[in-house]
Amino acid sequence: MTDTAETETPFHLRGNYAPVMEEVTAFDLAVTGSIPAELSGRYLRNGANPKSGWSPHWFAGDGMIHGVELRDGAAQWYRNRWVQTRSLHEPKARMIDADGSIDRTIGVNNTHVIGHAGKILALVESSFPCELSPDLDTVGVYDYNGKLDSAMTAHPKLCPVTGELHFFGYGFFEPYLTYNRVSAQGELIQSEPIDVTGPTMIHDFSITENHVIFMDLPVVFDFDKAMTGGMPYRWDDDYPTRVGVMPRSTADTSYGNADVTWFDVDPCYVFHPMNSFEDAAGQIIMDTARYPELWRQD
């Protein structure tokens, strides 16, 4: 590739980031060194892999799952599969129609892959999950048996004590934020709209032993830019910057919007908290990667 071609091709589409165009299945993989016999299971990863070979941003592009199965001290297989979404087969399908209606079955499901309650789910924060088989074939859109009304963040949190899966979905129209809780058995048992100021892009959140923590930050959805194919998010100096703390619900007590305590913080954006916990004094500590601002469009 020439220097000119490398300059013209975005970094997320060249070199090690370039899309993989073949689906491969391989068995009895060669191993350098040794794999402990006790290490057994599947390692899966998800990422943007545009089938067309082009995407405007590395957040875009069709989802592709790569997987390796380890068992009995051997690497049993490797395979990679596109997540067979509507967006893959109907690239021009719009999740948001001109009238503002939203179809959450449309999405690239390219950000994360999780296992919970016997389900393997490929996630993207704009849409419903996609269920996969153990061999990484796509089963289809999964909406918790019709109970899920919001999108599902690509970064849900699994409680190691209860086995519950906590997640949220943000919306371009009210309700702008919905908190959801799934039992260890895989049933959606709680959905709570949470009041935030506007259509903010909430990429991630935190849970601690006793609390759920939301970040209501000044990167907001821009409907007009979305309709013209531009970057649909922008920085808004007038949007309040807040962190919300809500007690976690239990079998005996349910908490929701009225129980959220909001704290004003300095303007910033956070994609991901690395850790959140309660110290011995009961204070909540959050470790985050903090940007002073993001996607300003002056």
Question: What feature does the model see in each segment?
Answer:
Residues M1-D298:
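Beta-propeller domains
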